[in-house]
Amino acid sequence: MATILTLAGDGIGPEIMTQAIDVLNAVNNKFALGLTLESGLIGGVAVDATGEPLPEETLQRARAADAVLLGAVGGPKWDGIERSKRPERGLLKIRSELGLFANLRVAKLYPQLVNASSIKPEIISGLDLLIVRELTGGIYFGEPRGIRTLENGEQQGYNTMVYSTSEINRIGKVAFELAQTRAQAAGTPAKVCSIDKANVLEVTELWKQTMIELQQAEYSDVALSHMYADNACMQLIKDPKQFDVMVTGNLFGDILSDEAAMLTGSIGMLPSASLDEAGKGMYEPCHGSAPDIAGQDIANPLATILSVAMMLRYTFKQEVAAQAIEQAVSDVLDDGLRTVDILDRNEAGLIQVGCQQMGQAVLAKLL
């Protein structure tokens, strides 16, 4: 029997997690998956309860679990505390401690939401791209880092961006193999676009060269292209359907995946998976804790529900159950239900619903 650790976290985390757990329990029963759910603390609520953003008990339970489902962490309540104790540090630590080096973010536009995006329908209709982000290296983890006082009394902040060939090869393999899988399913040529700033950053010069060597040695059937990060930001808006799989480092991936989220109409629609080398993973919505709307029952739970589908697909290899959730979400959108973030007030026949009503509508499609 497999175990899933649920970590609701802060802000809207508990609201969206409640709906995701209901959906998970439904597919668990419907498809006899044999999954057991546990819960734990992370983020600000963990700081309040234990003084640590990632309590040792939570970390040990996460290591023992087959997968982790996360809500969201952080909020202004904890902005003034010691940096090492802030909620976001718990998230960085659990990713690092579990070896979750590969972050997968799917930007897929549901046809029902084509008018919810700020981009013209003819540019984004049919969008389905995957961003593969290296998650445990780069500037977010590089040492040395800090804020120091110079001899003249001025303060200076500094960080270090580092990648080794082994780290680049590891994330590259994930991207190339996912491109092969997606191409086989779609009946299209496999392609990967590697994002860097090799013109000004030596660390990404190594990134680019390592990707080239990996593709030539092991993945000659996958077309590899390269693009500077600033141009990639522009191209995601100008012509997003030119991409299938994008692979990049931690910093650029963080930025590009949030940009890609808005192509879909709302970051509230984007799930994500963070995987280790064995396929064990942590699954979470791409959005943050949104403390400004917490407790108001207006958050969009669909990204978290779709994260459950990704978990079933990538960690538990339950494709039928994953597709059932995705179809249920699509059916609910067909019915015209919209949380406020994906509501087009100029479109007739839509029904504005809250977090709970949206989650329960998806659940009803699965029963």
Curated annotation (Swiss-Prot):
Biological pathway: Amino-acid biosynthesis; L-leucine biosynthesis; L-leucine from 3-methyl-2-oxobutanoate: step 3/4
Principal location: cytoplasm
A single GO BP: L-leucine biosynthetic process
Cofactors demanded by this protein: Mg(2+); Mn(2+)
InterPro entries according to UniProt: IsoCit/isopropylmalate_DH_CS (IPR019818), IsoPropMal-DH-like_dom (IPR024084), Isopropylmalate_DH (IPR004429)
Classification via Gene3D superfamilies: Isopropylmalate Dehydrogenase
A GO molecular-function annotation: magnesium ion binding
Residues annotated for Mg(2+) binding in this entry: 230, 254, 258
GO cellular component, one term: cytosol
Catalytic function, reaction form: (2R,3S)-3-isopropylmalate + NAD(+) = 4-methyl-2-oxopentanoate + CO2 + NADH
Similarity comment: Belongs to the isocitrate and isopropylmalate dehydrogenases family. LeuB type 1 subfamily.
Name recorded for this polypeptide: 3-isopropylmalate dehydrogenase
Source organism phylogeny: Bacteria, Pseudomonadati, Pseudomonadota, Gammaproteobacteria, Moraxellales
Gene that encodes it: leuB
